[in-house]
Regions:
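Nucleic-acid enzyme cleavage-core boundary/entry regions
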Residues: 1-98, 107-226
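Active-site glycine-centered loops adjacent to acidic/histidine catalytic or metal-binding residues
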Residues: 104
Length: 226
């Protein structure tokens, strides 16, 4: 995790505060501890960008996207851990920051990674309540992004497992059944028969995602998928 955020912990022996400035991590990042409810969070950021892959996180951090966009970048590293979900929940709840998810356009990214961030894992509702981010919104990559940003030749065919996962979500998952916009997006993906990774934008240049895609999308945050 990196960006305009100060995390205040305490020395377990002396009780003295320990302040971690997450804009001063060099080429690295702040590691979210497994237990983080005791931490004090201070930030001037405008939003949180939760990113699926380490590669994209590192690229955005290297180019200091968090500085130009005044946001906090969080690497989910696939399906986000309970600690990551709890930390992002606190950013959303305690600091009142909007949370946007940036994952691959495939059934796994949508139905596993994003869904887990948004509503939690398959555990009980009581447990999920503290380890999910109900206010999170899906920025992309969406099936419509493939068309809008002309990524058709940077896609891959959906695998049988992808088709099965998307159809199962449409038929059996209450979350996706609750949102017509998600039903439309998943059906669009199935009709197109393709998936796209975050790295697909590199067809337009290595910095396209930073200079074009993200700025365009963030301006339309109110239109993000629920």
């Amino acid at each position: 995790m990196v960006g305009p955020l100060t995390v205040v912990d305490r020395d377990p022996e002396s009780g003295e505060p320990i302040r971690s400035d997450c804009t001063a991590m060099g080429s690295g990042a702040y590691t979210i501890p497994s237990s983080n409810d005791h931490l004090i969070l201070e930030s001037s950021a405008q939003f949180v960008l939760a990113i699926e892959t380490g590669g994209m996180f590192q690229r955005l951090n290297h180019h200091r996207y968090w500085r130009s966009a005044n946001c906090i970048l969080v690497e989910m590293g696939g399906v986000p851990t309970r600690a990551t979900r709890r930390f992002v929940r606190r950013l959303a709840e305690d600091l009142k920051l909007p949370v946007y998810a940036f994952v691959d356009c495939d059934p796994y990214g949508i139905c596993n990674i994003y869904r887990t961030l948004k509503v939690g894992s398959g555990l009980s509702v009581h447990v999920n309540r503290d380890f999910c981010v109900p206010t999170a919104r899906f920025m992309g990559v969406t099936p419509q992004d493939i068309l809008d940003f002309k990524l058709e030749d940077a896609t891959h065919p959906l695998l049988p497992v992808d088709v099965k996962r998307a159809k199962d979500a449409l038929k059996n998952d209450p979350f996706f059944q609750s949102f017509p916009k998600w039903q439309k997006a998943l059906k669009q993906m199935l009709e197109m028969g393709v998936r796209a990774e975050q790295q697909a934008f590199a067809k337009w240049g290595l910095n396209f995602v930073i200079e074009e895609y993200l700025p365009v999308k963030i301006k339309k945050a109110k239109d993000f998928l629920p």
